[in-house]
Amino acid sequence: MADEIEAWFDAAGPRGEELRRVDELVTAAAPRIDRQLVPMGSSAMLGYGLMPYRPRSAKETTMWPLISLAAQKRHLSLYVSAVVDGEYLAEQRAERLGNVSCGRSCIRFTSLDEVDAAELSALVRDAVAATAAGGNGYSAT
């Protein structure tokens, strides 16, 4: 799997180094989290920490990453699939994360230099801790 992940970074071209920097931040904040490539249409994203998830429209539960990293055309996206006390953690902390654009679970930025790394690390740690403690309501949203 490590070779496939390295190939994914390399395939990102000039964005590969920025993706590696984000990967280092995530794995430093959550050192025991597993990593795997997750298919997304014709491409893939890097997923961290698979957890049970069932979309409202699905009849069966599947496995989905708690955190995902993807390179988009103009930015990077870090998806944090964590809902605590009815609020998406990414959306709840958007103002503290720096020069980012946030959706419910998506944090978009062009460079990690524009992100408050300490806040993003804390967000990753809190998402992992909430999930481990059974307090992540993402699959119920």
Regions found by a protein language model. Name each.
Residues 1-141:
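Charge-dense, helix-prone N-terminal extensions
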